[in-house]
Amino acid sequence: MSRRRWGVAALAVGALSASLASAPANADVETNGHHGYSKTRTVGYFIQWGVYDRNFRVKNLVDSGAAARLTHLNYAFGFLDEAGKCVSADPWADWQMPHTAEQSVSGKADEAGQVLLGNLNQLKQLKAKYPKLKVNISLGGWTGSRYFSNAALTAESRAAHVKSCTDMWIKGDLPGLPAGAAKGVFDGIDLDWEWPSSPGNPTPPNVIRPEDKQNFTLLLAEYRKQMGWNRDLTAFLPADPAQIDRGFEVRKVFSYLTFGTLQGYDYHGAWDPEANQQSALRVPKGDPAQFEFSSEVTVDAWLSRGAPRSKAVLGVPFYGRGWDGVAPGKRNGLFGTGVPAPAKYEAGYEDFHRIKAKLSEPGNSYKIYRDERAGFAWIYDGKTWWTYDDATEMKRKARYINSRRLGGAMVWSLDGDTPQGELIKALDGALK
């Protein structure tokens, strides 16, 4: 299931109680050239549940060449309990699942009696192989943001939340294991509260309060108070300008963040009746949607509200969205009505490598189309319509990031690429 949907159609369009801890002048702790980086950031999400149906493991990042190209790897997701404290969404995948020699980054099988197993042990091995790579734990996500409002509610709840999360993920104190068993796996924390002041995922919806907007800022301040300024503190941030205004004090938020990743996808999807772009750089001409969304709309919205260019990292998708039963119309299916297209994991949602494979299936009649002005691609066979970003579009996105002097690119999610790393190579190779 996609954990990045944001349900535009479902969204309806106070002073801080305590002084905020002042950020040092050098608040961006990993500017270009620092920690060995010579260009903008390349951030990628590794999904915890990918080890199951997708059989995508940390070792695949080595085999595809992705690990060598990333500056940051975000591990998705850790969850929050009702009290707002950190918990694992899946301890088996996180630290209990044994790996064979073939599945392991080190090439050695996990041993009987070994304390740390699972994805976290593989991430530890990955860091040993790529010591400049920063690995952060991502908290929340589309299905894991329900209790962020509880965590951020009071000074006491914020302090308890941050302590629980840093104890668990930074100090490595995992339930049932010796203290510090996972110390050194994670360098920092990525907050994926989707979204402050928004119900988000409808099943079940987030707890929301009018003060979520201000409390998110205070939560970031508490993270800096407890973690200091030498660790990454990042956040995944929405594409919708209305949601930005509902949930974020932009200048204050970015004063605490190392950088923020801007949602550059899910502009349209299965919740819309018309086949439409989901990650275009610009709004295509003739777009019939009620609201206009694009990467340019999102970037402009954040920058105009005070986000620093150097800290604004644009998200790009390694997946596509599709509709079935779409008539050709005048634009090769674009804006035609349809229903979510059949797919492997979720109707209307398909990994890039699976969409690419459709082009080489025997007897297929798919053709590739591009809107060069708006900056997006789709394939269409007269009935089924998929929009996605291929290597050509990744290079286009990288050129856009360069031209806007943004802080880099973020990928959701790395498992969607081909085994050869086609997309990450195209994206990273074109970033400056």
Regions found by a protein language model. Name each.
Residues W169-P210, D266:
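Active-site groove signature of glycoside hydrolases
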Residues M1-A27:
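Secretory targeting and sorting signals
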Residues V51, K356-K432:
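Extracellular low-complexity, Gly/Ser/Thr-rich intrinsically disordered linkers
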Residues L73, I137, L191, G260, ...:
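Conserved, mostly hydrophobic/aromatic
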Residues V29-P175:
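Glycan-recognition patch characteristic of GH18 chitinases/ENGases
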Residues K85-G107, P196-F352:
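Substrate-binding surface in catalytic domains of secreted glycosidases
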Residues T154-I189, L219-M227, D245-F259:
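An active-site-proximal structural segment forming one wall of the substrate-binding cleft
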Residues G33-Y37, L120-K134, G140, F216-T234, ...:
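Surface-exposed amphipathic alpha-helices with a cationic face
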